[in-house]
Amino acid sequence: MLSILILAATAAGLVILLFQRLWTVLGPHHVTPRESLRLLIVAGSGGHTTEILRLVGSLSNAYSPRHYVIAESDEMSAKKIHSLEELSRAQNDSTTEYPKYHLHRIPRSREVRQSWLSSVFTTFYSMWFSFPLVLRIKPDLVLCNGPGTCVPICVSALLLGILGVKKVIIVYVESICRVETLSLSGKILRHLSDYFIVQWPTLKEKYPKSVYLGRIV
């Protein structure tokens, strides 16, 4: 009987601890102003990269260093990122301290036309590489806009908070192409993001907790 009570008390304690961790991560929070913020940016392929780089191009130099994460087979996004950063350096005068940037690659979580069932396994495989990367970087902010690669990255960022390592702010910006329905990544991450931004009023009506700022890319 005593052993049962001990097990029950232990289980209850673990449940309470888990809820405390989840409240810390998902509950109300306050952002403390800082001189710089370590930024992790998830870039997809094609239009996703174009949109996210437009957002990055409008950020101040306070968002530094910048860590870009792309799929390991995405050479086009790598070229666009290098071009943006080099252009930013060329436009700054010699006295300006421009942000440092790093490029990281992880396995793609879902290929084009890949079945939903098999994508579950590839996403877990991508997660195997994502968590150590996010743990090493320990970003202050994750910025993403819908590619499948952002799911394992954002889940990894959430885990840092649950494990008590660091509270990471997750900002998800739904693609401008999404007018009436969310992308699959959006449907998943709207529950995990600190700020879920949509660019059409129709989506704001469907998802009242989202943030609508008009077209931002």
From Swiss-Prot:
Membrane-related topology note: Single-pass membrane protein
Keywords: Endoplasmic reticulum, Membrane, Transmembrane, Transmembrane helix
Annotated transmembrane regions: 4-26
Protein's UniProt keywords contain Aminoacyl-tRNA synthetase: no
Annotated Gene Ontology cellular component terms: cytoplasmic side of endoplasmic reticulum membrane; UDP-N-acetylglucosamine transferase complex
Ranges in the topological domain labelled Cytoplasmic: 27-217
Subunit field text: Forms with ALG13 the active heterodimeric UDP-N-acetylglucosamine transferase complex.
Family: Belongs to the ALG14 family.
Protein name, entry field: UDP-N-acetylglucosamine transferase subunit ALG14
